[in-house]
Design a protein with these regions (language model features):
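Active-site phosphate-binding strand-loop segment of PLP-dependent enzymes
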Residues: 7, 108-165
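N-terminal "arm"/small-domain region of PLP-dependent enzymes with the aminotransferase-like
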Residues: 1-30, 162
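Conserved PLP-binding catalytic core of the aspartate aminotransferase-like
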Residues: 256-267, 274-288
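Conserved N-terminal alpha-helix of the aminotransferase class I/II PLP-enzyme fold
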Residues: 19-64
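Substrate-binding/gating loop at the entrance of the active-site cleft, primarily
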Residues: 64, 85-101
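Conserved PLP-anchoring active-site segment centered on the Schiff-base-forming lysine
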Residues: 75-91, 265
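Amphipathic alpha-helix from the class-I
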Residues: 240-257, 271-276
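Active-site PLP attachment segment
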Residues: 186-221
Length: 288
């Protein structure tokens, strides 16, 4: 067992991924030096098409998930909206909300995974703001615990103003149908008010971030107006080609034994830790 990497499946060494990256490196070079707002590598279209099939929703590949949050959230959240953020939400989400503070957007922070407190805040804010955004993680990066997705979906059904923005990069690949993550594994459908962000830098085995949207309107808004598209360079062709190869592995049965092998290792570790009297903060079936 190796505890120093977020490459939970070891898929970054898969021959198909390496071969795809090498081929693209030879054919397109080390970089494609242009903003996506002007000229886009053809690899993006194929990668985003595959991700859209995996998640069943429009998908947008970003240079990183941090840049994805900084690009997406300021466009999605309006000046008359309010944000309720889990106290353990990833720092990259918190960095994006700092930009919204400059617009005087209302931001409340609530205790970790406390749905009772969240609902009380919704009741207080719902008559004062147009939309309410809940920001949190799918799998939290510090303790490896999960968001209560079923409860969040229930609240989104109960309160029309509530929208969910979840970062599930630590859940990507090792769980969920086609490796789509913990959120999609917890509830096997994409809520109409869910904005699910994830990425390829952990168990997926390549690099970059991913934003998914409930409909084409939000997708086009971020793709057309997002600063991360207009003022940032593209991912290298080799990374995009590797991402396409990894997508194809995820959409095949090949991903299943990799997930099962990791689950067996997690169970083994938890069992041995208990036998040895080691303190484990949370006994989740999580690699974090």
């Amino acid at each position: 067992m190796f505890f120093g990497s977020c490459g939970y499946l070891g898929i970054e060494k898969h021959p198909k991924i390496i071969e795809a990256a090498v081929e693209a490196l030879h054919s397109h070079g080390a970089q494609f030096s242009s903003s996506r707002a002007y000229v886009s590598s053809h690899y993006y279209e194929e990668a985003e098409s595959l991700f859209s099939k995996m998640f069943g929703r429009p998908a947008l590949v970003m240079q990183s998930l941090t840049l994805g949050h900084i690009t997406g959230l300021p466009l999605l959240v309006g000046d008359n909206d309010a944000i309720i953020m889990d106290v353990q939400a990833h720092d990259s989400i918190q960095s994006a909300t700092a930009m919204l503070k400059l617009r005087n957007v209302k931001i409340d922070i609530v205790r970790h995974n406390r749905m009772d407190i969240l609902e009380e805040r919704i009741k207080v804010l719902k008559n004062r703001y147009q939309r309410i955004w809940y920001l949190g993680d799918g799998v939290y990066s510090m303790h490896g615990d999960f968001a209560p997705v079923k409860e969040l979906y229930a609240l989104a059904d109960k309160y029309e103003q509530l929208h969910l923005y979840l970062d599930d990069i630590h859940g990507m690949s090792w769980t969920g149908p086609h490796g789509t993550g913990m959120v999609m594994n917890a509830v096997p459908y994409y809520h109409r008010k869910l904005f699910l962000s994830t990425g390829m830098t952990k168990a997926f085995g390549t690099a970059g971030g991913l934003l998914t949207f409930p409909d084409e309107e939000y997708f086009k808004l971020v793709k057309t107006c997002g600063k991360g598209f207009i003022f940032s360079i593209q991912l290298p062709p080799a990374i995009l080609a590797a991402t396409i190869a990894s997508c194809k592995i995820h959409m095949s049965d090949e991903i299943i034994p990799l997930q099962q092998s990791l689950m067996a290792k997690i169970d083994y570790f938890n069992k041995k830790a208990e036998e040895l009297g080691l303190l484990v903060i949370r006994k989740e079936q999580s690699p974090v």
